[in-house]
Each structure stands twice: as C-alpha cells, then as structure tokens.
Amino acid sequence: MHGVALIQRRHLLQLAGATAAGLAGAGAQAQAAPLKEMRLDYAYYSPTSLVLRRFGWLEEDFRKDGVPVKWTLSAGSNRALEYLNANSIDIGSTAGLAALLARANGNPIRTPYVFSRPEWTALVVPKDSPIKSLADLKGRKVAATKGTDPYLFLLRSLQTAGLRKGDIEHVPLQHADGLAALRAGQVDAWSGLDPLMASAELDSGARLLYRNVSFNTYGFLNVREEFLAQHPAEVRRVIAAYERARQWTLANTTEAAKILSEEAKVSLQVALLQLKLRTDLSNPWPSAEHVHALQAASPILQAEALVKPGVDLNRVVGELVDTRFGATVQRA
C-alpha cells in the first residue's frame, strides 16, 4: 500500500530505540523463556487493531523468530479485561477508565500505548422516544455493559443530573445485545458503543440523548504486567506495529474505514462516521494528559462503590499509566 511508504525509516528507528529505552526497565529483573506465541486482541472499537490484523505486519515481524500470532476478538472492554486477567491474552484493548477499574480491583495490567482518543459512547434513545433529558431516565430501563466505558459513562452522566445508579433500572447486556434490546423496545435507552452506536444513528434514526466527549476515556492498549516484565522487547515490537497501523490509518482513512466496515459488518457510512468524526489518533503516548483524565474520572468508581473502600485511585492511576515510554519518545 502506498501509505506505508509514509512511515520513514528514521521514525521507525527512533521508535525502536525509544521503546527499548522506555520498556527496558520493566524487564530488568525478570528472566523468561523465549516467547512461544504472541497473544493479543482486536476490536471493532479499535480500528488500528483491524488494520494491523488485516495486513499481517505482526505475523511478518514474528515469523523470523518462529513465533505465531494469535488474535482474539474482544466484544468490549469487559471481555478484553477478562482475557487479560485469565492469562488467555497478553495484550488487550480497553477504555482507560475500564482499565483503571480493573487494575484497582486486582487485574495486574499496565498501559504503555494509547490507541485512540475516541468519542465512542453516548446515551442513545429511539428516534420517537419521549425521553428528552437525563432527568427523564429516572425509573427507566437502560442497557449498558458493566465494566466498560459506556457503563461508566452512564453513571457519570446520571451524576450530572443528580441521579445515581439506583435511580434507573440497569439492564446488563453486552453491547450488541443492548442495541438489539433498544431496537426491540425492551429498554428505554442504551449506553452505546461505536460502531454499533453509529449504526443505530444512521440505520435506525436513533437519537443521541446525551453526549460528552470528556466522559469518553482513551483507548488503552494494556499489557499483563508479568508479560511486560518478561518480554519488553516483544512488547516494543507490538507497539511499533501499532504505530505503523496508526500512521497508515491517518494517511488512508477511507481505506481504513473500508476495513472497519468489512470486519464489523457495518456500512461504509457508519465506519466513516466512527473513524473520521469520532476517533482521534493524534496522541499515542501515555502522558500527564492521560493521568489527569483518569484522575478526573475516577471519583465515580468510589461514589458508586465499584472499588473497595480506601483504595488510593491516584496511586492506581500511576501504576496503570506507563508514561516512561511516551516521555522517551518525546525526547527522541
């Protein structure tokens, strides 16, 4: 593809060197057997993961070491976090606040890369719904997937209207099932996730009841802490491949949308809405920006008793967000 040529040799050399420096410390105290399989996820809410998988760049890189690449589809942050915690994948894609919740509750993950800054969730109602405001959700059935950004977005949104989780009837459904329930009239509202949310808008005329970009947390590429310590060089190579996919997507947005359309089985218009208008790929390096965003979002976890009392969430944010890599890249 012609867009790949945009990735200059100098950039890749800087990336490799910076990542090595940024992650070397993680493996300084760990000795591990050679990697036998690279296990990671892909997700429709992470378009660059679809690009990376489609072009086989990881397979190409690891083939010389005789290491196969195993891809697992994550239907939501909750699934990716389950896979990470169960040691069935080593690298997984989630929302930032969902990753923080998981880390606070004992899932040993770290985040050395940010795959997007999205507006991937909002509160959705049918086009003819009488619901006009957040206050109207009181006593209503609202579908949302627990342990994901849409669920946490719902809780934060309710809080702005003086409501809490107990003021609605939460219906815990996986994202696709939540949309199906909304279309069938089984719930009054749904805390959506792209590309399903974009499909609801364009294909069903659904209305976004409440949007708040700042309540959408970043797309975090999480690594099991043990794996990061034992295989920092391999993590470096995965991040370098993600960077290649990010650069290609920025240069070939329509082509990337076609890949998203084919993989997620949505129309090209839906994929373009998600990728062009609601996905920011400009800042992949974990930094103070991401730390501050999670610190601002974290109080909802304690307000709704989603973490144990007394958990120091600022400390957990520091344990999760691995800013060493980003700081090194910025100096390169």
Cite the ranges covered by each PLM segment.
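N-terminal signal peptide c-region/cleavage motif recognized by signal peptidases
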Residues: G25-G27
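Conserved C-terminal helix/tail region of periplasmic/extracytoplasmic solute-binding proteins
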Residues: L301-A332
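Secondary-structure end/capping motifs
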Residues: H231-V307
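Short, glycine-/small- and polar/acidic-enriched structural segments
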Residues: Q31-R164, H170-P172, D188-S191, L208, ...
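Pocket-lining segment of extracytoplasmic ligand-binding domains
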Residues: L97, H170-V171, A176-E262
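Short, surface-exposed acidic
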Residues: G66-K70, K165-I168, A264-L275, K308-R315
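N-terminal secretory signal peptides
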Residues: M1-I7, H11, L15-G22
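Sec/Tat-exported extracytoplasmic proteins
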Residues: F62, S88, S93, R103, ...
